[in-house]
Amino acid sequence: MKRLLIIVGLFLIGCEDTREVECNECILEISASELQESTDGQYILEYNQDLAQTYTMLDATTECGWSQHLQWDTDYQYLIGTDWVSLVNPGSMTDGDGVAHVMFAAWEVFIGDTITVYCGYTDDCGVHHLDSLKIQIVDNE
């Protein structure tokens, strides 16, 4: 009986998960690497009149590794039928380097506007990270 208690005790102690969640120094920095940045820190998107929408890729760096779910939104939306549509896809996932990408698209009605893009996520330690950037929609043609 004593031997059985020792074996059960060792089994329970040996199978206990004593790992602690490592709270890395996660960050969130979003950018628009394909766009020119103005002197006031805003990005400039030149609208292409040959397309229904003009697209660009936005980037997010978290330094938190793979599989962080990021949520995106903008302060402007576009009405399609009866649905309001954001100018950015609502979600993306980070890769092994902690980097995520998402598409941003503007319609012609946004020429002259400055759109604020928001991105956020909550890391494994429960810390919420939020960042934003501004994109000016211009038509220089």
Task: Label each residue range with its predicted role.
Residues 4-13:
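Sec-dependent N-terminal signal peptides
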Residues 113-114, 124, 132:
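Coil residues (strongly favoring Ser/Thr
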Residues 36-65:
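Solvent-exposed, low-complexity, repeat-rich "mucin-like" stalks and linkers
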Residues 60-82, 108, 132-134:
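Short, well-ordered beta-strand segments
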Residues 108-116:
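Short glycine/proline/serine/threonine-rich loop/turn segments at secondary-structure transition edges
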Residues 100-109:
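Short, hydrophobic beta-strand segments
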Residues 12-41:
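Bacterial Sec-dependent N-terminal signal peptides
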Residues 94-100:
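Glycine-centered loop-to-beta-strand initiation motif
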